Design a protein with these regions (language model features):
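Amphipathic alpha-helical polymerization modules
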Residues: 1-190
């Protein structure tokens, strides 16, 4: 292939890749806890015969915008706002532990607690609560319930959200919107 065509094609391919990342960021702008992806481009000289003015472009990696987004007050008992470098542990589709910034917790018909359709991990694995109970979340992530017929003071702890500290750059973004450690080992709870 002619070097000039190759150089032009590499620039067009990288522009398409960057456009896909921007489109994904725009599509997820209202997704709770979403972290925008950032693409960095770098020029590199084309090796071989010819003038040194021929330069190709290559993606230097995809990063993540770790800046804290606005906290939205919902007055919903199962919505949590996480601190700046705090992530919530969830179970990924393959059963491994992954992390998210989403805080819109749900309880399904079996009592399983989830966020974004993924089971929330606590002290001893995925968290479940008794069906029909009123769920309360403490500031430290403690999950307490008041079952039907119990007095208003009768809260029983059933678990604790696994919250982890993750400094920018220590986790890798997955294609499923979750974050993982580079060595796939779970992080310790805070």
């Amino acid at each position: 292939m002619d070097r000039m065509l190759f150089t032009a094609m590499s620039g067009a391919n990288q522009a398409l890749e960057q456009q896909a990342v921007v489109a994904n960021n725009l599509a997820n702008i209202v997704t709770p806890g979403f972290r925008a992806q950032l693409v960095e481009m770098q020029s590199s000289p084309v090796a071989g015969e010819g003038l040194p003015t021929r330069v190709s472009v290559a993606a230097n990696g995809i990063g993540v915008d770790w800046s804290q987004g606005p906290v939205v007050h919902t007055d919903r008992a199962l919505d949590v706002a996480l601190g700046e470098n705090v992530m919530l542990a969830v179970q990924a589709g393959d059963g491994s532990e992954a992390y998210t910034r989403r805080g819109d917790l749900q309880v399904d018909g079996t009592g399983a607690m989830s966020v974004g359709g993924r089971p929330v991990i606590g002290d001893g694995g995925p968290i479940t609560v008794p069906l029909g109970s009123e769920v309360t979340l403490g500031c430290d992530g403690t999950i307490s319930v008041r079952e039907l017929g119990m007095s208003p003071r009768g809260l029983s702890p059933v678990g604790k959200l696994k919250l982890v500290s993750a400094l920018p750059g220590t986790l890798q973004a997955g294609t499923d919107g979750l974050f993982r450690t580079a060595n796939t080992q779970p992080l310790a709870a805070d």
